[in-house]
């Protein structure tokens, strides 16, 4: 049997992860077993266990693979381009990267992954993904302010995700329109989301203090 492929490659999810999402699209995710995934991927259970000891580990690997594809396509931030436009490009790279597995993603979301624990783990993974997205466009995701920006971007992403799941256009034009609208709204009402890294600047020079006139 084929050996399990390495995880987290920038060129996309490995065959085991792809097999899991293909099964999710055909069956209910909660009904897909690890044995089913091994059979679909043409690997032994031992090889599957070595690569991914649980279905949640497969979902985590998928998120990481998508993150790597998004970051691999990132370019150094252009100061002439607005943060809104940079975020638009980064999130559209994410939707483009996920398109081959869209049916599987929809099925997994309908089933709520494997219950509350998996859903909470998924939320943590998405927050990490959004933090990396912010960093890739030149916006710091560190500290309390970074946490607010990360959660704000996650809200934009999840709102657009609902449109993307139903978008049957070849160029994802509905998704692009929805994303642009949500980012524009965020830009209008939550300027902290679009606050990039500020260059360190010296404090303004103080005017010289004139000696007080004699009394």
Regions found by a protein language model. Name each.
Residues 2, 135, 166-215:
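C-terminal peripheral helix-coil segments that are non-catalytic and often amphipathic
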Residues 64-70:
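Short, basic, alpha-helical segments at the C-terminal edge of helix-turn-helix-like DNA-binding modules
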Residues 15, 23-61:
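Helix-turn-helix
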Residues 116-139, 147-159, 177:
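Amphipathic alpha-helical packing segments from all-alpha helical-bundle domains
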Residues 15, 36, 86-89, 93, ...:
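Amphipathic alpha-helical interaction segments
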Residues 61, 75-107, 114, 124-125:
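Hydrophobic alpha-helical connector segments
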Residues 19-23, 97:
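Short amphipathic alpha-helical elements of helix-turn-helix/winged-helix folds
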Residues 3-16:
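Short, Lys/Arg-enriched anionic-surface-contact patches
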């Amino acid at each position: 049997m084929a050996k399990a492929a390495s995880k987290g490659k920038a060129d996309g999810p490995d065959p085991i992860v792809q097999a899991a999402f293909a099964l999710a699209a055909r069956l209910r995710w909660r009904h897909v077993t690890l044995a089913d995934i091994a059979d679909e991927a043409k690997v032994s259970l031992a090889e599957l266990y070595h690569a991914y000891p649980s279905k949640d580990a497969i979902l985590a690997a998928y998120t990481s693979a998508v993150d790597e594809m998004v970051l691999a396509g990132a370019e150094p931030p252009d100061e002439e381009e607005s943060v809104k436009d940079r975020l638009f490009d980064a999130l559209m790279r994410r939707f483009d990267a996920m398109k081959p597995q869209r049916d599987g993603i929809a099925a997994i979301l309908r089933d709520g992954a494997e219950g509350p624990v998996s859903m909470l783990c998924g939320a943590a993974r998405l927050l990490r993904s959004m933090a990396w997205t912010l960093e890739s466009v030149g916006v710091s995701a560190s500290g309390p302010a970074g946490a607010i920006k990360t959660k704000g971007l996650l809200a934009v992403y999840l709102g657009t995700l609902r449109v993307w799941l139903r978008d049957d256009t070849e160029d994802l034009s509905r998704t692009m329109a929805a994303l642009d609208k949500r980012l524009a709204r965020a830009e209008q009402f939550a300027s902290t989301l679009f606050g990039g890294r500020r260059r360190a600047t010296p404090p303004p020079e103080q005017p010289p203090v004139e000696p007080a006139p004699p009394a």
